[in-house]
Design a protein with these regions (language model features):
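Structural scaffold elements adjacent to functional motifs in cytosolic proteins
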Residues: 4-6
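Short, surface-exposed ligand- or partner-binding patches at beta-edge/loop junctions that are enriched
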Residues: 54-56
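Rhodanese-like catalytic fold shared by cysteine-dependent sulfurtransferases
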Residues: 10-51, 60-98
C-alpha cells in the first residue's frame, strides 16, 4: 500500500481537487518557503518505512522533496508522482473537490 501525500497549498488543492484518500500536508507556502510544520505533521502521520508518493502541481517540487527524504533521512520508499496533479487532470482522473 502507498500513502499519497499532497504537498500543494490549500488554494492549489481547492482549485483542482485532490486524489481521494490522500493526506494533505502543505510543504511550501505560496512564496516557495518550506513550511516548518510540515515535518512534524508528516512524522505524526507517516512512518519513514511507509511507501510514500508525494504529489505536487507538476511533479518537480514533489521530486525534490522525495529525493531529500532519501538523501537526508535514508528513507528509501519515498517517491514522486511524475507530472503531478496536472498529469492526472490531463488523464481525466476523478479528483475529489473539498
Amino acid at each position: 500500500n502507498y500513502k499519497f501525500i499532497d504537498i500543494r497549498t490549500k488554494k492549489e488543492r481547492d482549485n483542482t481537487g485532490t486524489i481521494p484518500g490522500s493526506l494533505e500536508i502543505t510543504a511550501f507556502d505560496i512564496y516557495g518557503t518550506f513550511v516548518p510544520e510540515f515535518m512534524k505533521t508528516f512524522q505524526d502521520l507517516v512512518d519513514l518505512n511507509d511507501n510514500v508518493v508525494f504529489i505536487s502541481n507538476e511533479g518537480e517540487i514533489s521530486s525534490i522533496l522525495a529525493n531529500g527524504f532519501v538523501e537526508q533521512l535514508g528513507a528509501t520508499n519515498m517517491h514522486s508522482f511524475s507530472g503531478g496533479i496536472q498529469q492526472l487532470i490531463k488523464e481525466d482522473y476523478n479528483l475529489s473537490k473539498n
